[in-house]
């Protein structure tokens, strides 16, 4: 087979070669179904993580927790002083009833 007879067959060979190339490359391209599944997953993740607090929110929460911790310490000291005063009052009441 000489070159001229091969060139005469080019209209028939070109679609076969192009089809073979597309068939060989089909794995390198994502299917529409796969892309849609990935888009759905991405949308679901974006929706789920949209409500997660950011760094500023976490920082603000830490500050508020520190404030609450200080308030709790103050309240604890006040409760202890009230408890001590109640003990003294009860002791005084018991001593009066014994006399």
Curated annotation (Swiss-Prot):
Gene Ontology biological-process annotations: viral release from host cell by cytolysis
Q: What induces it?
A: Expressed in the late phase of the viral replicative cycle. Expression of late genes is activated by the viral late transcription activator C.
Q: Does the keyword Membrane apply?
A: yes
Kindly list the cysteine pairs connected by disulfide bridges.
none
Pfam families on file: DUF2730 (PF10805)
Entry's transmembrane regions: 3-23
Q: Which InterPro entries match?
A: Phage_Mu_Releasin (IPR020269)
Q: Does the keyword Transmembrane apply?
A: yes
Q: What superkingdom does the record give?
A: Viruses
Which compartment or compartments is the protein found in? Host cell inner membrane
For membrane topology, the record states: Single-pass type I membrane protein
Which keywords does this Swiss-Prot/TrEMBL entry list? Cytolysis, Host cell inner membrane, Host cell lysis by virus, Host cell membrane, Host membrane, Late protein, Membrane, Transmembrane, Transmembrane helix, Viral release from host cell
What would be one Gene Ontology cellular-component term for the protein?
Answer: membrane
Q: What job does this protein perform?
A: Facilitates the release of the SAR-endolysin.
Q: Write down what this protein is called.
A: Releasin protein
Native source species: Escherichia phage Mu
